[in-house]
Each structure stands twice: as C-alpha cells, then as structure tokens.
C-alpha cells in the first residue's frame, strides 16, 4: 500500500524512492509488526480474559502445567493482526506470492480459531476432530499447491494462467521449467525434476506437514515462537537471494521473479513473533493456540516452496520435525505393542518430545532455551547452503 503511494509521489518527493528498496521495507515491516504487537498485546489479553477463553490443560500431562489452566489462549490472533497490517502496509500488493501466502496463513488461522473455540466452549483439550481439521487443511493446501506449481514457474500472472492451460491441453502430462525443480542442498549442479504432479504432492506435504508440526511443538511457554521467528527470518534471506537476478546467478540458484517480496512477509512475521514472545515468555500471560500455530506453520511451508528450499526447511525446522516424529513413533509403537502383547508400551515418557524432557527432570525454561539454541544452530547450518555448494 505504502509502496504504491510512494511510487505515485516519488517524482515530486524524491526521498520516497527509498520505498523501492526491499531491505528498507523489510526493516519497516519488522518494526511495524513489533510495535503493533507490543501496543495491542495488553488490550488483546484483557479481551481474551474477559471472554473467558482460558486454556484447558491435559490432566495426564506434567503436573507443573496444571497452574496454567485458565491462561487465555487464542493469542495467535495478535500475531496475525501484526502480520496482516504490516504486510499490507509495506509489501507490493501486486505480487502474487504475497496473496497466496496470506491466503494459506489466514486460512489455516481460521481453522485454528475454530479448533480453539471448540476447546474453550466445550472445555475439551482435543478441540476439532482430526479428520475435520485435516480436511480443511488439505483443501487449502491443495489449492495453494496447484497455484504454486505454475506461479513459481512463470514471471507474471498472465503467463501463470497460460502455463496452466498448456498443461490442461497436454492432457495433464506437461512438465515444468527447471526453476520448479527440487533443489538439493550442497549440490550446485544437481536438482530433481518434479513435474506438475510431483510439485503438487510435495508442496501439499510441506504446507500441511509444517502447519501440524509447528502446532505439535507449541506446548511450553515461548517454545515455538522463537524457532518460528528464526526459521522465518532465514527463509527471508533465501527469498532475498532467489528474488534477485544478480544474487541468484552469483550463488547458482534459479531466479524466482517476485520471490523477494517474501522478505517483507518474513520480516512482518518476525516482528509480530517477537512482540508475542514479550507476553508468552515464562510465565506466559497468553498462549498462541491453534489459531497462531497452524497459521505460522502453514506460512513457513508456503514460503519454503516459493523459494524452493523445502529440504532446507526440513533442516532448519529440525525441532518441528523431531516433535512430530516423536508423536508418530509413540502412537505407532503403542498401538503395535497393544495389538501384539495386549498392553500398550511407550518409547518416550510422554510425547511430544518436549514433555519427555520435562518428565526427565529438565525445567520448562531449560527445554525452551535449549530448543531455541538447537534451532539457531540448524538455521545457521541451513544458511550455509547458500555458499557451500
């Protein structure tokens, strides 16, 4: 919005040309989202408290968590407000990638809001049924996957439609340009051609999988938001590189026209996330809830697809992956042993993984900060793939 206004006035007001710089708008987006969160945070928390949307705590979880019962949840709304306002102010609203990542983020946010609402109203920690939640996530994820399959491959909205129609006329068998291939980290000359169907399948798994992985990680005060900020900021660096014809050529990456605007969204997400952490740090005044976790996870997955860094997301989001795998292993092993021996057995003391460490004697703050440190190291490792190829 402000970019369009600046472009209209820059012939008369020369200093407005600074708005054309991605880096300037990225810093501005971070500060804007941060200030919105810090200013609106107390008001949002008061409103959530008045609405009595307190978190229902699992009785079979760590006993230290019982004191958190009643802490207002659905605080992810604060993050989404900061992201929305900051992105709309500072991003190029003619950019197609901005709108698809906004659609996924807020679409998943609505799913999370409904889930949180049911938890609060019915006092049931389970919320929306897994099948219902998965259906709506799949609907949004598949739409985004189909759109991104063609928008990543072309430089303009018109050519995106032309490419889609060419695929239809080919009997759904046409391939995609090389820029849509799966990039293999550390290997500068090796990519894996996905084709349309492979791209759609991978994108769907990345978006929906990331959303649920972040949601599973959101279990302790401040645990998930800092990794989201770190991973999102790192993806913003990739967006800046992939969106630049000069830097992408120098670093031997495919140039994705328009991907640079993802830096603005990542910056807004980082600022909003830090503002939320101000209130979510231990002891938390507010919880993110599914409205925030599902939305942020979906956003990370979508951005990773746009900048062609799906594998790097897997690396940098290693904490999210570990939390998800711990749940899958726990459930699978429990069901297998119950069918085999008549009694379910567990691999971990409790899943997701952060609860296992709590029950092993780690303090909540120790788990949180150590997971932050691990994520920071993984993000630095992921960023190293920019040059170590």
Curated annotation (Swiss-Prot):
Location, primary (coarse class): membrane
Cofactor field: Mg(2+)
GO molecular function, one term: UDP-N-acetylmuramoyl-L-alanyl-D-glutamyl-meso-2,6-diaminopimelyl-D-alanyl-D-alanine:undecaprenyl-phosphate transferase activity
GO biological process: cell division; cell wall organization; peptidoglycan biosynthetic process; regulation of cell shape
Pathway linked to the protein: Cell wall biogenesis; peptidoglycan biosynthesis
Parts of the chain that traverse the membrane: 25-45, 73-93, 97-117, 135-155, 189-209, 222-242, 259-279, 286-306, 311-331, 366-386
Compartment list: Cell inner membrane
Coiled-coil ranges from the UniProt annotation: none
EC number assigned by the record: 2.7.8.13
Gene Ontology cellular-component annotations: plasma membrane
Alphabetically ordered keywords of this record: Cell cycle, Cell division, Cell inner membrane, Cell membrane, Cell shape, Cell wall biogenesis/degradation, Magnesium, Membrane, Metal-binding, Peptidoglycan synthesis, Transferase, Transmembrane, Transmembrane helix
InterPro entries linked: Glycosyl_transferase_4, PNAcMuramoyl-5peptid_Trfase, PNAcMuramoyl-5peptid_Trfase_CS
Membrane topology, record value: Multi-pass membrane protein
NCBIfam families according to UniProt: mraY
Family according to the record: Belongs to the glycosyltransferase 4 family. MraY subfamily.
Protein name: Phospho-N-acetylmuramoyl-pentapeptide-transferase
Annotated source species: Paraburkholderia phymatum (strain DSM 17167 / CIP 108236 / LMG 21445 / STM815)
């Amino acid at each position: 919005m402000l970019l369009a206004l600046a472009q209209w006035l820059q012939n008369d007001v020369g200093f407005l040309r600074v708005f054309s710089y991605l880096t300037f708008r990225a810093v501005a987006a971070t500060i804007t989202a941060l200030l919105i969160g810090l200013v609106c945070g107390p008001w949002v928390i008061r409103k959530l408290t008045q609405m009595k949307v307190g978190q229902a705590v699992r009785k079979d979880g760590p006993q230290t968590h019982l004191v958190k019962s009643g802490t207002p949840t659905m605080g992810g709304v604060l993050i989404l407000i900061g992201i929305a306002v900051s992105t709309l102010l500072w991003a190029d609203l003619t950019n197609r990638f901005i709108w698809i990542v906004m659609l996924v983020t807020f679409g998943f946010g609505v799913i999370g809001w409904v889930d949180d609402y049911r938890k609060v109203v019915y006092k049931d920690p389970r919320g929306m049924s897994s099948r219902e939640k998965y259906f709506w996530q799949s609907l949004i994820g598949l739409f985004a996957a189909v759109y991104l399959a063609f928008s990543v491959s072309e430089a303009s909205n018109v050519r995106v439609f032309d490419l889609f129609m060419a695929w239809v006329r080919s009997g759904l068998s046409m391939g995609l340009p090389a820029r849509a291939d799966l990039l293999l980290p550390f290997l500068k000359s090796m990519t894996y051609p996905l084709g349309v169907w492979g791209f759609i399948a991978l994108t769907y798994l990345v978006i929906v999988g990331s959303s649920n992985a972040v949601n599973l990680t959101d279990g302790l005060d401040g645990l998930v938001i800092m990794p989201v900020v770190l991973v999102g900021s790192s993806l913003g660096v990739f967006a800046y590189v992939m969106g630049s014809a000069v830097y992408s050529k120098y670093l031997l990456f495919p140039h994705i026209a328009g991907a640079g605007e993802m830096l603005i969204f990542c910056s807004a997400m980082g600022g909003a996330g830090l503002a939320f952490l101000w209130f979510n740090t231990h002891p938390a005044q507010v919880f993110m809830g599914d409205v925030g976790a599902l939305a942020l996870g979906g956003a990370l997955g979508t951005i990773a697809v746009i900048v062609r860094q799906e594998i790097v997301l897997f690396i940098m989001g290693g904490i999210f992956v570990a939390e998800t795998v711990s749940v899958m292993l726990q459930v699978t092993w429990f069901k297998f042993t119950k069918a085999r021996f008549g009694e379910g057995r567990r691999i971990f003391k409790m899943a997701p993984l952060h609860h296992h460490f709590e029950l092993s004697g780690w303090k909540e703050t120790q788990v949180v900060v150590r997971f932050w440190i691990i994520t920071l190291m993984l993000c630095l490792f992921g960023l190293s793939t920019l040059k170590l190829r």
